[in-house]
């Protein structure tokens, strides 16, 4: 069985930039611990990616904090994480969940049996969105989330997202 690790949105703006939190900074060692368990060919990272006109988008009107603008320092994978995933596939996504990531995982699953584990940010937005997309597309595979290698917008919303995923038969480790 091929085990895949998805490193979700470990970007500067979400760690210690425009939308950073102490909890996001605190998970860095745990994310690195999980990355170290996998071969680079089995790691896929995502980057939240917005245009310069972000504030004019629907998301920008509801979350009026410019972040992860393509090409900016905040859009880059955080410097504490980037060396560990150098050479891994990185998928840019324009919103919370990535259909491109999901399609890639489905394609891999056609050739071999897989399991998927997710780590990263934010538990209650992008981690839950991607975990649910994958679980919906591939209901028979094992999908897991490493709780101490994820952080939410707040500790309460982190816990709520973990509960939601558990109720949808996603393993919470």
Predicted regions and their residues:
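Histidine-anchored nucleotide/phosphate-binding helix
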Residues: 32-36, 128-138
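Glycine-rich oxoanion-binding loops at beta->alpha junctions
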Residues: 92-103
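A short helix->loop->beta-strand "cap" motif at the edges of active sites that frequently abuts
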Residues: 39-41, 139-142
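Short acidic-hydrophobic, aromatic-tinged amphipathic segments that line or gate anion-handling sites
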Residues: 91-92, 171-173
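Short amphipathic alpha-helix with an adjacent loop that forms part of the alpha/beta core around
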Residues: 101-112
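Active-site acidic carboxylates
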Residues: 1-90, 110-111, 153, 159-166
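Active-site-proximal beta-strand/loop segments in catalytic clefts of secreted hydrolases
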Residues: 46-49, 94, 121, 148-149
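A short glycine-rich beta-strand->turn/loop micro-motif centered on a GG-aromatic cluster
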Residues: 117-122, 141-155, 173
